[in-house]
Amino acid sequence: MDDFQKRGQALIDELKEHVLMTFSRDPRGSNNGPGLATIDIERLSGLGIQLDRASERKQEHWITWTILQRLIADGLVMPIYSDKTRYRRRQPTSA
């Protein structure tokens, strides 16, 4: 991996940490809360990207969604499926 690729990975890691910190800004995102919708996380974290032209596929939300999927895979966030998917921090496991 060259320096440019390393910087890209560092940016992804920063985004993951930033989104994780967002959960502590709203009690709904706590490990016993009802969860936050993707749009709530996007707004609280400041990751909303305003496009001049709205996309039918809502591509302006893909960054937040992708980071959430990575946090789920890492075991740090849990999806809650209902009428709309919501997310909350996972309960820390004791060692």
Model-identified regions with their sequence ranges:
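A short, conserved structural fragment
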Residues: 72-82
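Short amphipathic alpha-helical interaction segments
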Residues: 55-73
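Short, cationic-aromatic polyanion-contact patches
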Residues: 82-95
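Short acidic, hydrophobic short linear motifs in intrinsically disordered regions
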Residues: 29-55
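Coiled-coil-like amphipathic alpha-helices with heptad-repeat character
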Residues: 11, 48, 83-84
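Short alpha-helical segments that sit at the start of domains
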Residues: 1-35
